[in-house]
Amino acid sequence: MTNGGTDREAPTLDQARRQVGRYGLDVDPQAVLVAVRLISAGARVGRAAEAHFSRFGLSTGRYRLLADLEDCGGEKSPSRLAADLDVSRATVTGLVDGLERDGLVARRASVEDGRGAVVVLTARGAQRLREMAPEHFGRLEEMVGSLSVEERAVFLDLLARVVRGSSALTDE
């Protein structure tokens, strides 16, 4: 993608055709172009999300953890958080450490398993989510505001299919 949010995209379909032809591959250049642009768009949206969440003293990961805790009633084990957020336990530990320092979450012994710990959303963490909600959700709506309701439904379906196909990049 180019800077400044213009509609000009790189690479072009012609460039993808040349690249595929250069290597003598039997792959669809348009499929390659869609994948390359999706990866680029994902990186760009990721950078925008980090800038967005930094307004609230958070990162994307820290926000996702807080929102996940709020959605499940306020507490969850670190291993469950890792599974639900699709990140490693080490990542959860780092996120929780920072959120705990800021008073947004706390660790406590599990009632179900005295040996284990759970991460708990604090009142301060819940307040942070409430305070940021109007701006946060307003900006999310604005981000996809140029899409009609029907286009958003199609986009969600297409996105789910692409995400399922993303294992092609990680499979051995």
Predicted regions and their residues:
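Key DNA-contact positions within bacterial/archaeal DNA-binding proteins
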Residues: 90
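Charged, amphipathic alpha-helical coiled-coil/dimerization segments
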Residues: 97-157
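Short capping segments at the starts of secondary-structure elements
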Residues: 72-77
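Alpha-helical residues within the helix-turn-helix
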Residues: 54, 83, 100-101
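Short alpha-helical "packing" element that flanks the helix-turn-helix/winged-helix DNA-binding module
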Residues: 62-66
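N-terminal leader segment of winged-helix/HTH proteins
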Residues: 1-56
